[in-house]
Amino acid sequence: VSLFIGCLVLAGILFSGCSSSKRHDRYVVVLSMDGFRSDYPDRAYTPTLDSLAKVGIRAAFRPSFPSVTFPNHYSMATGLHPDHHGLVNNFFYASDLDSIYRMADPTPGFYGGEPIWNTAEKQGVHAASFFWVGSEYPIQGRQPFIWKPFDKKVPYSDRADSVVAWLQLPEDIRPHLVMWYIEEPDAIGHICTPDSSATLEKVEELDRVLNHFRSEEHTS
């Protein structure tokens, strides 16, 4: 089953070419709903996503090859294709390292390139990660200022509330870049197929989570 990644950039930030005062007024939240096919909003009730599309940009999918979770998410973090950043699949053997990469037990030595949270931290901009691929281990000796080890049992609404809480932290520890990963509707799509009613129901649930996040963020 080929599933692609839906990614939302919910706010804007510039890391260079701006004064420190301007930089501290800007935020970006990158939310990936894994396996979110580009046609899902046309087939499910997604008023929040629809409203964002009207004021932003909606694009066709542009996956890296292979179009699976870990290579694509690390490509988004680094701006590199999988053959340049090292994660060429969710599970693979690397002869140069004589080691096997597994999603359930990833090895830090596989992660090449510079993820965007490292770029931010180098420039004095705190970053946070909620389950984003590559953030659980130091890369080039760095991690996001705030990060969470993956735990699929954490309710989606709690994840949204955590991101809002991060954006309310005191300025000296507040992240201005948040990378936020949700493992659905990929998981349900693999179990029930992407065209199933269960998958579309999950898409609608995620739209409600996004609406909850926007409501909490706007009132904070």
Describe the residue ranges of each PLM region.
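Bacterial N-terminal signal peptides
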Residues: 2-13
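Extracellular/periplasmic catalytic domains that process cell-envelope and extracellular macromolecules
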Residues: 21-25, 43, 67-69, 121-122, ...
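Mature N-terminal segment immediately following signal peptide/propeptide cleavage
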Residues: 23-41, 58
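Metal-dependent active-site segment of extracytoplasmic phospho-/sulfohydrolases and closely related
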Residues: 30, 48, 205-220
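A residue-level signal for conserved active-site and pocket-lining positions in enzyme catalytic cores
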Residues: 34, 76, 120, 180, ...
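Short, structured active-site-proximal loop/turn typified by the sulfatase FGly-forming signature C/S-X-P-X-R
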Residues: 39-84
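His/Asp/Glu-rich, glycine-adjacent segments
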Residues: 81-196, 202-205
